[in-house]
Amino acid sequence: MKKLIYYFGSNGSDGNASMKNILGNKGAGLAEMSNLKLPIPDGFTITTELCNYFYTHNNNFPKNFQSDLKKAITELEIITGKIFGSTSNPLLLSVRSGSKVSMPGMMDTILNLGMNNEVCNALADSCGDKRFALDSYKRFLEMYGSTVLSIPSDLFEQICEKHKMQADIHKDSDITVELLEKIIDDFKRLHIKYTKQLINDPYEQLESAIKAVLHSWMSNRAVIYRKINNISEDCGTAINIQAMVFGNLGKTSATGVAFTRSPSTGEKKLFGEFLINAQGEDIVSGTRTPMPIIANDSNSMQAMMPEVFKELSQIAQKLEEHYLDMQDIEFTIENNKLYILQTRTAKRTAIAAINIAVQMVEEKLISKEQALMRIDPESLNQLLHTRIDYSKGLTSIAEGLPASPGAATGIAVFSPYDAEKLSHHHKVILVRHDTSPEDINGMHVSSGIVTIRGGMTSHAAVVARGMGKPCVCGTSNLSIDEKKQILTAGDIVIKQGDIITIDGGSGKIFLGEMPLIQPTFSEESKLILDWADEISSLKVRANAETVNDALVSVKFGAQGIGLCRSEHMFFDKNKIPLVRDMIIAPDIERRKLAVQKLLPLQTEDFKALFRVMKDKPVNIRLLDPPLHEFLPTTEEDKKNLANSLNLPLSMINQRLHAMHEVNPMLGHRGCRLGICSPEIYQMQIEAIFTAIFELHKKEHIECNLELMIPLISNVGEIQKLKMDIYAVIEKLEQRYRYKFSFTLGTMIELPRAALGSKKIAKEVDYFSFGTNDLTQTTYGISRDDIASFLPYYLEEKIFESDPFTTLDEEGVGELIDIAIKRGKSSNANLKLGACGEHAGNPASIEFFHRMNLNYVSCSPYRIPIARIAAAQAKIKHG
């Protein structure tokens, strides 16, 4: 068996920062801080190997683990000068989880372990503070009971509230020694009620606590968190056991969390919160509203503990310069002595991540490449957050702490269950006293989060920032009744289902729906995206067919349009009647008449698009979907169509019935329409090239056209359509006395097209991989129907991910690889692109880079994500 226990502390460390795989993120940080000679409580880390062994050996420990554990405790006793379980000089322990990847609040922690009646008395004697000893015992019974013994945590809270009410006490800090003794007695009875015994033996407490932490790795909340954040279940958790240091020893003791820069904005100054006379869980759980580390008032640490503040500032700077990244630091102050409990790379908003990355490049701490690798591409969604338009003179009903930026409107809900249930039909704002890891699903589906208690580093704040959701915490002027499902702000009563708006940037809450403003990119955002474009070899284009889409695309840095779905233009209310006339027309003459009416409208559509894009490439796909998608479905629309065509309704119904297809997505669509109904493609070709000529002649705009044929499966299809297309273009060149320049390409979206790409490539200038249909036809799964079984497939690990979100490299990717190799073998100059949903997915973009594609094309709002992902792929793979 490999080494399972690594020491750290005042005598140095067995490990270092590079050992996250076995020591976990927290353990590696503690080891590294030991090596940096920082003040940390002595302790040891039990490696992730134990977790993996535990789950593969029927929840048992390895043979010699218990004896190794006792040796480690003995070593800790020698270093600290205290004895575990002693009735004269007791050593108390903290037991904390720590996986390779940080999972804030998802795993279990036990403090003050080793407590019993005798130890409590000894602790009181040694420190001369009975209230502190009893408070520590109370905390242990509550944490051990809820975490290890699975006693519902609200039962402990109910006992406390009952005693406080009877004694007419409102603050925990006012609880007397006598009241603490009564609460402890009731806590003990609760333990005995649930487990038939009170576990007093310190080693039995320790072993059961270790098992509880290991079990928490597979807890429902941790599994959900890992799924949401794509964290592997195989890495397991390490366990960190440390000598307790106490932040609840009185007014010269405290606990807190500090960030070396602002996690919301990236501003370069120490940011954080602390609580006097408290333990670590008080601040991260959000059950008490903390005070700031830096502020202009007398309640800040800077004002109350200036010497400790100075030391903390120096340590924070040292840690950031050592790790070359913003740090999240947990600390405890015991009788004015500072201890660092943990440091880790801090979670941050997308805005903060970009600002910090740019600052650190300017400070010459890191390179542009390192800066880009620190940006989570998906987090850039946060840059698209809306904000409230305050120019309208709005009045808020409440104000709390601005815990996570952005604005959101939705119906107020008061439980995670209701959030999940109602989110299917509404945007929801989850309102809670405070959140806990069990609320993770409800938080995930909510548009925003409000908590009555808690601060900027509470569970709600940290998780909301990680999810990119607006969050307001510490709204002490609000009161909530979760049972009655009402929220009260002064005289205003908000019931479940009432609409509220929250501003996570200012901490304000409003009744009703507020006017919102779309965000704009900061100069730092533009700069880091420019760096991405400098580095990446994969160009990023947009899927766009409207002027608005094109404008948004250009704003977000698109280098062209990679997919213009021309059929989307047909759904305009002025065009759809003509399209229906064209489809339903009983004879060729009527059809041609409808086509001619459509021609000038389509011409204007294309002109508008080319104007926005100027000389950037615009890849126009000819009509693709089956014609039934344009046809009326309601009786009223059918009657209107009959009237416009001056035909009986029965004939319309007969024609609709004749056009019905059993499987239209594999039926009469794409190039098959162009071959069987050539007048449609002919009209589109005339509209496109007329638009190009008119812009050239009248507005001096030189268009960069790429013309694409959809759903090819056979080289004969492309040869036939190519002939028809060039015949129309030749006539237009004669009419306008102008030579058109363009490239011709095809979608590769069917397996047969991929396999037959050698012949197809000879006929075209480029391939564009339509990965949506290629995935559908490779798997034999409809994208519209996969939701009925995908959750089960993911749960059973039949699929590793949704194949319509992340490209299946093994199957679909293999077809793309074949198509590229065979296509290039017959056409060395073949250009390559991808335009499905996968083209905006970072993992898929990495694959497209490895396949040496020229560009990807995604929705306008995925462009910033794709630009960063393309640069990261280049940095990783060259």
Swiss-Prot record:
Positions of region (Linker 1): 348-404
Keywords: ATP-binding, Kinase, Magnesium, Metal-binding, Nucleotide-binding, Phosphoprotein, Transferase
Catalyzed chemical reaction(s): pyruvate + phosphate + ATP = phosphoenolpyruvate + AMP + diphosphate + H(+)
EC number: 2.7.9.1
Protein's UniProt keywords contain Ion transport: no
Obligatory cofactor(s): Mg(2+)
Binding, Mg(2+): E749, D773
Record-linked InterPro entries: ATP_grasp_subdomain_1, PEP-util_enz_mobile_dom, PEP_util_AS, PEP_util_C, PEP_util_CS, Phosphohistidine_dom_sf, PPDK_AMP/ATP-bd, Pyruvate_phosphate_dikinase
Residues holding ATP: R96
Regulation: Activated by light-induced dephosphorylation. Inhibited by dark-induced phosphorylation. Both reactions are catalyzed by PDRP1.
Modification note: Phosphorylation of Thr-457 in the dark inactivates the enzyme. Dephosphorylation upon light stimulation reactivates the enzyme.
Molecular function (Gene Ontology), one example: metal ion binding
Phosphothreonine sites (modified residues): T457
Enzyme class: transferase
Region (N-terminal): 1-347
Protein's UniProt name: Pyruvate, phosphate dikinase
Underlying gene: ppdK
